[in-house]
Swiss-Prot record:
Monoubiquitinated by the UBC2-BRE1 complex to form H2BK123ub1. H2BK123ub1 gives a specific tag for epigenetic transcriptional activation and is also prerequisite for H3K4me and H3K79me formation. H2BK123ub1 also modulates the formation of double-strand breaks during meiosis and is a prerequisite for DNA-damage checkpoint activation. There is a cross-link at residue 133 (Glycyl lysine isopeptide (Lys-Gly) (interchain with G-Cter in ubiquitin)). It comes from Coccidioides immitis (strain RS). The lineage of its organism: Eukaryota, Fungi, Dikarya, Ascomycota, Pezizomycotina. PANTHER family: HISTONE H2B. Residues 1-10 have a biased composition (Basic and acidic residues). This is Histone H2B.
């Protein structure tokens, strides 16, 4: 174990480190040890994407068409961006109406505000259809 900052002896070289500060102690960042002293295997951070859902929709619309990784990444970013915009707008609408819960009504209104014209109409109708299907299957 390295000595603590207070226990370190002053260097005899006469030069101070760059910046005038003593070097910070380095902590061993990726090495987590179990109580018995064994190294734990570090689990990879999970990155959730919409890739599988985008692929399923693509195969429904164009069964013989593929998609590159770059195109999938762009579509995934697009879905994340739209999701964030709708969620932010719905949150604002709920706050304006002094409500702490975002309902399907706030989502629908935020979609109408964010998406232009015909696209908003189609999105609202598909959303309503999905909510109806979910409600009927949940019973």
């Amino acid at each position: 174990m390295a000595p603590k900052a207070a226990e370190k002896k002053p260097s005899t070289g006469g030069k101070a480190p760059a910046g005038g500060k003593a070097p910070a102690e380095k902590k061993e960042a990726g090495k987590k040890t179990a109580a018995s002293g064994e190294k734990k295997k570090r689990t990879k951070a999970r990155k959730e994407t919409y890739s599988s859902y985008i692929y399923k929709v693509l195969k429904q619309v164009h069964p013989d068409t593929g998609i590159s990784n770059r195109a999938m990444s762009i579509l995934n970013s697009f879905v994340n961006d739209i999701f964030e915009r709708v969620a932010t707008e719905a949150s604002k609408l709920a706050a304006y109406n002094k409500k702490s819960t975002i309902s399907s009504r706030e989502i629908q209104t935020s979609v109408r505000l964010i998406l232009p014209g015909e696209l908003a109409k189609h999105a609202v109708s598909e959303g309503t259809k999905a909510v109806t299907k979910y409600s009927s299957s949940a019973k």
